[in-house]
């Protein structure tokens, strides 16, 4: 019980003799001043006046009636007829009615009669303020005039409180508290919480209780400095708002000073904590009343003190702040509330009685009421109190339950200072601080559990959470999905895949990171595992495409569009964002956080393998994880100098690092028939711990035909599509993680017409991968090339790798395991991974039909790069990147975000710096066939990637060229003196018709593949030279075809691929008198040292490095380690599919970069270089059937 409770519950006993009232000796007699004394003590008074307030007793003591309202509370019998007789019969009648009403109301105090001074409020239907007001009414003496005046005021007070109680019954306490603090803040004040507010007020009192005058700034700084150890959130702003609250309550005496801040001195009446706190609380209550808020004393006590022990304190404040007009306003307010709720309890019947009570004058000096007015008032108050009790018992939603204090994250999370310093706490069990170590730990643990709870959250576009996620330390279960956008929603069993899947789980170090992971997956899509994959176009992607969702990728350990069966897989579906006018690029996985445990180096051999798949064909099954062996999660090791923040980690196991495909990829928009069934069945996973390959929906993956000692690599390049940087923005090694398997594909909108004539052996039912994502990524990088590109002839010849016939060549290009260690730590920008072309001639061709009738910028077949820098038609290229450019213009650059920063004047830092160096060769190997036969580059014209200019034209970005130098550097001899240039502007072109000769192509492919066994044994220097050998063989083939000159130039642009292979030279444009054999010997260095470079001419991205001095061929040799990048003047390598008018100068940063040796089969791809003369009028003659024509 509150301390002050006994002051008003002792009305059942005599305040003089302290004896409980009874019906015999200690009969209660009420005086006109509302004090009730037993008759024995009253007879002992020396003078007829109240012993407490000395109010004169006008009526004879023997005439004063016994207060039977109080007697019935102590169990006495109330007589039916009392002996009191008033002056006239009319007054007696009104008196009896009024007395009866009071006695009836007193019955609501019956639970208080359990014993002397003992009150049990729990069984009462009335609130404590109502009980206190009712006790005041019961103690009124109706016989005396003053008593009747007091009774009228008590009746009015009861009626007013009844209205307030009824309004409170219709309010939402949570909404009420929010409105209260909003009103407080609107007045420049602030309440910091019960504990912190108390400490702040005590510190203000400590600073000013001695009468000192301080400026507001000094006072605030003092309080903040003292609060910071216990409340780190204390700030000058918040404490300033507390001081403003006291200032508004007129607690300070302000002294103004000229040209200086005013001094504040605490008024004398507020130099104690109780007085200061009461004025503080009264100011908050006053603000609430100004805002029209009705808050019960219980709520006030909970809000301001964090307990329920200050209800009486708050009620007294409320009562003092009540105005005579507030009653009438409350009645109107109640009427409005009842109209809104429909008034199920018919409370409108109380309105006349409430209005009668509101009209009573609350002034103590008011005129005495008549007996009729007294009767009417007593009847009215009895009616409204009965109505309130009836509503609480029958219609109240919350009943008469004490409101529980709202949970506070700081509740009992620190030790009580009073207990520590003084050995005891005056608040006792109501203290909001812990009083023992056990209590402290208990509430801290409870807060942690509350914070760890995952609540369901609404997703965009009606996406809901199907299951509540319980976060554990072992896994993250993502069950986020949308039945609207995805056909199926499957909960994951171990965070990523099925229970039988042995792929490691995503380990969360804390619940916070788990929540962030779930939040990120919520925004992006769903990760589920139900053993299903999207095979070809699915209804899911069609549905999602309708609502404009981001590209979505079937993520699986096998080929996503594999026609064969697949049992285990995961699917990542992006959640659509309807508000976005374009395809949004958001991190698929959680952002970089130190709370998330990532994976180790994927290059290292790990002791477990990915789950086993149904084996069909001749591929051996991968080993499985033994039972009981915990799966190990590899961690991706980044280069030492790469900023950690710039490389958001891939936070899923390596088998799930797939690119996301546009839903266009899987729609039935392809003009071709569906692909034939896969002859090999499901693809076994990569057992080495590296990334499993990403597959586009138009091809079937075939694993490599060879096996290395250290690792089995798949045919993969970094995916071109919409993989975000935070998914796969790791070191250079990880970006080009063994350039096999990942490959880039250009994309064509499904609606564009196609003019391709597929080969008979190549059923092109390939679904096109959308390139809108990577298109929108680099508008500015392409911008500088648009102005110089001529319209190119599109090659739409489909690839042969989708064919069910296996003889299609398989070229696997791989980097050594220590590739990333040899590179420097320059930050790798995100979009590089999405534009790299495959170097496998067997797989690249599937991309050739991506952009219909569009210029093909480059041919990158079998590790050789032919660069297109010289086309001038802007319009032909513009719409390819229109979406990207529009998106970038709308998307402002955020300097320190994880997204790329790209200047509107061009891609300055999007590519890797020249610091990435490697000495490792790029080895192309294949095993098929036994004979060796030179193959013209025309044989591989169909295998062209529409976005392979990533390997080419971007080389003329001075700051990003080394990105390609490290792959595409070739040592070639300056062919300028050994070739004759065409005097016309005709370009070399190749008819597409000759490429349709399937038997010839297959035979040449088989012969090319036969070179693997022979060339694998060559050392690193031989790889360089053999690469050039293949190029020279093509020169020789071109020379033999000199008779074919003009036929290919007449073909339609959509039907042929123009092969532009030019050796550019600015010094000797007219000398090709030396034999090709001599040039070949010079280039290959066969006549001399094998470990020396030949002509000293390094081709950067296929560009020959400028020779600054002319020496005999044998004097031009330089070692591999001395290869430096020299600025080129106007040297390019012209692509097969390019039709151009002028070269684009390439500026390569000066850095020491060792070339990557590419071992290519003879004739696989012939790299021809041509140095443009100053007048830019020398071009090569057309080529027929891969043979070069020399004029």
From Swiss-Prot:
GO cellular component, one term: membrane
Region described as HEPN-N: 91-170
Region (ROQ): 171-325
Compositional bias of kind Polar residues: 530-546, 554-576
Record GO terms (molecular function): DNA binding; double-stranded RNA binding; mRNA binding; RNA binding; RNA stem-loop binding; ubiquitin protein ligase activity; zinc ion binding
Binding site for Zn(2+) 1: 14, 17, 38
Record PTM text: Proteolytically cleaved after Arg-509 and Arg-585 by MALT1 in activated CD4(+) T cells; cleavage at Arg-509 and Arg-585 is critical for promoting RC3H1 degradation in response to T-cell receptor (TCR) stimulation, and hence is necessary for prolonging the stability of a set of mRNAs controlling Th17 cell differentiation.
Residue numbers spanned by region Disordered: 528-576, 644-680
Catalyses which reaction(s): S-ubiquitinyl-[E2 ubiquitin-conjugating enzyme]-L-cysteine + [acceptor protein]-L-lysine = [E2 ubiquitin-conjugating enzyme]-L-cysteine + N(6)-ubiquitinyl-[acceptor protein]-L-lysine
Tissue: Expressed in spleen, testis, ovary and small intestine.
Transmembrane segments: none
Pathway, per record: Protein modification; protein ubiquitination
UniProt EC number: 2.3.2.27
PTM-bearing positions, type Phosphoserine: 549, 808, 983, 1119
Activity regulation annotation text: Binding to dsRNA, but not CDE RNA, crosstalks with the E3 ubiquitin ligase activity and may inhibit ubiquitination.
CDD domains for the chain: mRING-HC-C3HC3D_Roquin2
Source organism superkingdom: Eukaryota
SUPFAM superfamilies: CCCH zinc finger, RING/U-box
Keyword Phosphoprotein: yes
Region of interest (HEPN-C), ranges: 326-396
Chain positions of all zinc fingers (C3H1-type): 410-438
Subunit-structure text: Interacts with EDC4. Interacts with CCR4-NOT deadenylase complex. Interacts with MAP3K5; the interaction is probably stimulus-dependent.
Function: Post-transcriptional repressor of mRNAs containing a conserved stem loop motif, called constitutive decay element (CDE), which is often located in the 3'-UTR, as in HMGXB3, ICOS, IER3, NFKBID, NFKBIZ, PPP1R10, TNF and in many more mRNAs. Binds to CDE and promotes mRNA deadenylation and degradation. This process does not involve miRNAs. In follicular helper T (Tfh) cells, represses of ICOS and TNFRSF4 expression, thus preventing spontaneous Tfh cell differentiation, germinal center B-cell differentiation in the absence of immunization and autoimmunity.
Protein name: Roquin-2
Provenance organism: Homo sapiens
Gene behind this protein: RC3H2
């Amino acid at each position: 019980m509150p301390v002050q409770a006994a002051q008003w519950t002792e009305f059942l006993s005599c305040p003089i003799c302290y004896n409980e009232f009874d019906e015999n000796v200690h009969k209660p007699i009420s005086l006109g001043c509302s004090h009730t004394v037993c008759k024995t003590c009253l007879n002992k008074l020396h003078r007829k006046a109240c012993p407490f307030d000395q109010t004169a007793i006008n009526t004879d003591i023997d005439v004063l009636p016994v207060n039977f309202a109080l007697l019935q509370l102590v169990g006495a019998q109330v007589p039916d007829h009392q002996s009191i007789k008033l002056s006239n019969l009319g007054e007696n009648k009104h008196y009896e009615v009024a007395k009866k009403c009071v006695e009836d109301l007193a019955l609501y105090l019956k639970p208080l009669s359990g014993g002397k001074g003992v009150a049990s409020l729990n069984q009462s239907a009335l609130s404590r303020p109502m009980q206190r007001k009712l006790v005041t009414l019961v103690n009124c003496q109706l016989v005396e005039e003053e008593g009747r005046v007091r009774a009228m005021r008590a009746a009015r007070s009861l009626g007013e409180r009844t209205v307030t109680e009824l309004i409170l019954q219709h309010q939402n306490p949570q909404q009420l508290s929010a409105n209260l603090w909003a009103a407080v803040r609107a007045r420049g004040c602030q309440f910091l919480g019960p504990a912190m507010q108390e400490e702040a007020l005590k510190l203000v009192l400590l600073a000013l209780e001695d009468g000192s005058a301080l400026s507001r700034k000094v006072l605030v700084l003092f309080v903040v400095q003292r609060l910071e150890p216990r409340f780190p959130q204390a700030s000058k702003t918040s404490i300033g708002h507390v001081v403003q609250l006291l200032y508004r309550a007129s607690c300070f005496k302000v002294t103004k000073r000229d040209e200086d801040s005013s001094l504040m001195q605490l008024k004398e009446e507020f130099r104690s904590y109780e007085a200061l706190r009461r004025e503080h609380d009264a100011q908050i209550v006053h603000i609430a009343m100004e805002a029209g808020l009705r808050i019960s004393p219980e709520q006030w006590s909970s809000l301001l003190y964090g307990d329920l022990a200050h209800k009486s304190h708050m009620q007294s404040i409320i009562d003092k702040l009540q105005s005579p007009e507030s009653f009438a306003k409350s009645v109107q307010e109640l009427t409005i509330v009842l109209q809104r709720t429909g008034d199920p309890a018919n409370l409108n019947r109380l309105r006349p009685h409430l209005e009668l009570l509101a009209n009573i004058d609350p002034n103590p000096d008011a005129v005495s009421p008549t007996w009729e007015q007294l009767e009417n008032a007593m009847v009215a108050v009895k009616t409204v109190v009965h109505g309130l009790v009836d509503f609480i018992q029958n219609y109240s939603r919350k009943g008469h339950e004490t409101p529980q204090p709202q949970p506070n994250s700081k509740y009992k999370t620190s030790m009580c200072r009073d207990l520590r310093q003084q050995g005891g706490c005056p608040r006792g069990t109501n203290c909001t601080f812990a009083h023992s170590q056990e209590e402290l730990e208990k509430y801290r643990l409870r807060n942690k559990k509350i914070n760890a709870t995952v609540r369901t959250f609404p997703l965009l576009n009606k996406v809901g959470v199907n299951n509540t996620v319980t976060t554990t330390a072992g896994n993250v279960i993502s069950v986020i999905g949308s039945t609207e956008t995805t056909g199926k929603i499957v909960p994951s069993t171990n965070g990523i895949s099925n229970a039988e899947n042995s792929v490691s789980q995503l380990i969360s170090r804390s619940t916070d990171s788990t929540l962030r992971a779930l939040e990120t997956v919520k925004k992006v899509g769903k990760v589920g595992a139900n053993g299903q994959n999207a095979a070809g176009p699915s209804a899911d992607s069609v549905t999602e495409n309708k609502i404009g969702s981001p590209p979505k990728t079937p993520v699986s350990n096998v080929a996503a569009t594999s026609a064969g069966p697949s049992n285990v897989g995961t699917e990542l579906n992006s959640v659509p964002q309807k508000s976005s006018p374009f395809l949004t690029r958001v991190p698929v996985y959680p952002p970089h956080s130190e709370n998330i445990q990532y994976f180790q180096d994927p290059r290292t051999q790990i002791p477990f393998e990915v789950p086993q798949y149904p084996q069909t064909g001749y591929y051996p099954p991968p080993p499985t994880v033994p039972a009981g062996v915990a799966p190990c999660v590899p961690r991706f090791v980044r280069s030492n100098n790469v900023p950690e923040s710039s490389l958001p980690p891939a936070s899923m196991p390596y088998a799930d690092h797939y690119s996301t495909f546009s839903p266009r990829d899987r729609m039935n928009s392809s003009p071709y028939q569906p692909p034939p069934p896969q002859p090999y069945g499901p693809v076994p996973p990569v057992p080495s711990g590296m990334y499993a390959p990403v597959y586009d929906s138009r091809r079937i993956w075939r694993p490599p035909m060879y096996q290395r000692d250290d690792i089995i690599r798949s045919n993969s390049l970094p995916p071109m599509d919409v993989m975000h940087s935070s998914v796969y923005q790791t070191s250079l090694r990880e970006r080009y993680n063994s350039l096999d398997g990942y490959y880039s594909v250009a994309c064509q909108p499904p609606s564009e017409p196609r003019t391709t004539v597929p080969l008979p052996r190549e059923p092109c039912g390939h679904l096109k991968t959308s390139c809108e994502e990577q298109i929108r990524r680099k508008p500015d990088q392409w911008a500088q090339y648009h102005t110089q590109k001529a319209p190119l002839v599109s090659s739409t010849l489909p690839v042969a790798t989708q064919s069910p016939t296996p003889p299609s060549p398989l070229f696997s290009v791989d980097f050594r395991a220590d590739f990333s260690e040899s590179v420097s730590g320059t930050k790798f920008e995100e979009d590089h991974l999405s534009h790299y072309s495959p170097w496998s001639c067997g797989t690249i061709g599937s991309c050739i039909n991506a952009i219909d009738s569009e210029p093909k910028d480059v041919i990158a077949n079998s590790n050789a790069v032919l660069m297109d820098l010289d086309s001038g038609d802007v319009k032909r290229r513009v719409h390819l990147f229109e979406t990207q450019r529009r998106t970038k213009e709308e998307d402002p650059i955020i300097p320190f975000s994880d997204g790329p920063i790209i200047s509107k004047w061009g891609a300055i830092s999007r590519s890797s710096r020249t610091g990435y160096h490697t000495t490792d060769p790029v080895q192309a190997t294949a095993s098929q066939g036994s004979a060796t036969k030179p193959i013209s580059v025309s044989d591989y014209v169909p295998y062209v990637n529409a976005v392979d200019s990533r390997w080419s034209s971007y080389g003329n970005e001075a700051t990003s060229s080394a990105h390609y130098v490290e792959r595409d550097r070739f040592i070639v001899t300056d062919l300028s003196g050994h070739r004759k240039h065409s005097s016309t502007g005709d370009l070399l072109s190749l008819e597409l018709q000759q490429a349709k000769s399937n038997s010839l192509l297959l035979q040449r492919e088989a012969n090319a593949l036969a070179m693997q066994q022979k060339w694998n044994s060559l050392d690193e220097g031989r790889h360089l030279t053999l690469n050039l050998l293949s190029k020279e063989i093509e020169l020789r083939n071109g020379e033999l075809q000199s008779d074919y000159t003009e036929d290919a130039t007449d073909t339609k642009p959509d039907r042929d691929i123009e092969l532009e292979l030019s050796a550019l030279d600015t010094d000797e444009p007219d000398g090709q008198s030396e034999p090709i054999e001599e040039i070949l010997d010079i280039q290959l260095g066969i006549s001399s040292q094998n470990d020396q470079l030949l002509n000293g001419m390094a081709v950067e991205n296929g560009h020959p490095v400028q020779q600054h001095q002319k020496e005999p061929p044998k004097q031009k040799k330089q070692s591999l380690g001395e290869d430096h990048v020299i600025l080129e003047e106007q040297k390019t390598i012209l692509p097969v599919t390019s039709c151009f008018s002028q070269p684009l100068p390439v500026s390569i940063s000066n850095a020491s970069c060792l070339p990557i040796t590419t071992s290519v089969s003879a004739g696989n791809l012939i790299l021809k270089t041509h140095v443009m003369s100053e007048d830019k009028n020398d071009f090569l003659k057309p080529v027929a059937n891969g043979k070069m024509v020399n004029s």
